[in-house]
């Protein structure tokens, strides 16, 4: 397709209030446009880039045994109340009611939904280990969205959920993911450093950021 036929336009200059270089480049190249605070539309050329990255992620996670699924963006409040995070997480978790006055949430993460699914599908330890993952639209009402796509309220996140018989297998799966992420970054042409980080509300023994 010719550039002249693409939906969306390139910009000679980024808006004056845009400070981060990556944000400026994405706007000027016609990859994204802002709809609201921390909310962006991906134009065709930007979405093609997202799909190429997603394909690399899928290949590398399925290489270590991952099976892709898709979870609902809207979750029932019951599963969040059962986990205790309904009361722990503040206004970042968007809560609302349906027409039947039932409490619902826009999922900012999917541990609760996956746990509910596992209770239905896994009946014996003999079915383990299993590894499921998704590339999912999520919503977190961040109080300070900034820096373009670096810190947004609606975002696409890849998450894996490792179901293991014991902690040793869980540690092995963590190591496999660690290596898979390095391969993903390498295939995207990125040099990265892995830094140990706080586990945060996810819990666990160890976490890394790249």
Regions found by a protein language model. Name each.
Residues 1-209:
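TRNA-recognition modules of translation machinery and tRNA-sensing kinases, especially anticodon-binding
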């Amino acid at each position: 397709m010719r550039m002249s036929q693409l939906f969306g336009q390139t910009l000679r200059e980024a808006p004056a209030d845009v400070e981060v270089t990556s944000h400026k480049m994405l706007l000027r190249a016609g990859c994204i446009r802002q709809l609201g605070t921390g909310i962006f539309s991906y134009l065709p050329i930007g979405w093609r880039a997202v799909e190429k990255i997603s394909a690399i992620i899928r290949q590398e996670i399925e290489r270590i045994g991952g099976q892709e699924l898709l979870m609902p963006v809207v979750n029932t409040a019951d599963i969040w109340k059962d986990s205790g995070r309904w009361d722990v997480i503040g206004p970042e978790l968007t809560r609302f009611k349906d027409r039947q006055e039932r409490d619902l949430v826009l999922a900012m993460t999917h541990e609760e939904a996956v746990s509910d699914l596992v209770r239905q599908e896994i009946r014996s330890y003999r079915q383990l280990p299993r590894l499921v993952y998704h590339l999912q639209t999520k919503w977190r009402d961040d109080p300070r969205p900034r820096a373009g796509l670096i810190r947004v309220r609606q975002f696409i996140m890849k998450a894996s959920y490792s179901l293991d018989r014991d902690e040793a297998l869980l540690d092995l799966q963590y190591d496999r993911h660690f290596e898979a992420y390095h391969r993903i970054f390498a295939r995207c042409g990125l040099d990265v450093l892995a830094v140990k980080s706080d586990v945060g509300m996810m819990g666990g023994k160890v976490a890394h950021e790249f």
